[in-house]
Every structure is written in structure tokens, then in C-alpha cells.
């Protein structure tokens, strides 16, 4: 059985590029013995209610959205698997869904920036 170091955060404030104050919450942040970081994020302003992100050696190794557009969520996951975190942010940041100032891909990019800081 793998031991894991779990760090729970109540809420991490995050600002949308549009200037509107929104809260994007990190539900859990776990680092497994093999070095895989597993983060659960509650996105804001989209249909999805949870994003589960696995990162190992600065690459996204698994991605899953809960609720939202099932096919699009699976497509995003298939495309970013194996991609470097920096590249995911570069490609997905700023994508909008209809008239919303954000989207599920944008929420992923914002979550990764929140986790790794603006340097990524």
C-alpha cells in the first residue's frame, strides 16, 4: 500500500484575467511515493464540478473532469496526457466557452498556474 503525504487547502483565491474575483478551490493536493502529484480542484464559472490532475516529472499523466461536457472533457484529457505543464498552460489559457470569461480548458490552465505559480 502506497503511503501518501496529503495537504488539504480550504480555499485558494484566484483572479480571472477579466478582473472578476473568483475562488478556485484546491480540494486536495497529494504527493505519492512514486513522485506523482494528485490534485483535485473545484473549478469556477464552468459546468464541471471537479478536476483531478495527476502530474509526474512536470508532465500531466492523468486528467479527469467531473460533470460538464463529457466528450470535450475526455478529448482535453487525451490531448494533454504526457504534455509538459508549461505547454498545457500556454495552449489552454484564455480559452472561453460561449460568453463566459473562462472554460474547462482555461480552468485547467489556471489550476496549473495556481499550483506551480506564474513562472510556469
Indicate residue ranges for each PLM-predicted region.
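Bacterial N-terminal signal peptides that target proteins for export
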Residues: 1-9, 17
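Sec/Tat signal peptide C-region and signal peptidase I cleavage site
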Residues: 18-23
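Active-site- and interface-proximal helix/loop "cap" or "latch" segments in soluble metabolic
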Residues: 35, 42-120
Amino acid at each position: 500500500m502506497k503511503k501518501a503525504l496529503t495537504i488539504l487547502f480550504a480555499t485558494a483565491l484566484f483572479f480571472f484575467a477579466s478582473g472578476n474575483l473568483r475562488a478556485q478551490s484546491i480540494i486536495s493536493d497529494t504527493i505519492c511515493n512514486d513522485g506523482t502529484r494528485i490534485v483535485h480542484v473545484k473549478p469556477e464559472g464552468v459546468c464541471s464540478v471537479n478536476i483531478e490532475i495527476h502530474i509526474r516529472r512536470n508532465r500531466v499523466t492523468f486528467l479527469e473532469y467531473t460533470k460538464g461536457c463529457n466528450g470535450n472533457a475526455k478529448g482535453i484529457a487525451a490531448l494533454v496526457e504526457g504534455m509538459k505543464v508549461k505547454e498545457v498552460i500556454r495552449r489552454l489559457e484564455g480559452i472561453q466557452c460561449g460568453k463566459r470569461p473562462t472554460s474547462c480548458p482555461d480552468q485547467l490552465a489556471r489550476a496549473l498556474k495556481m499550483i506551480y505559480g506564474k513562472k510556469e
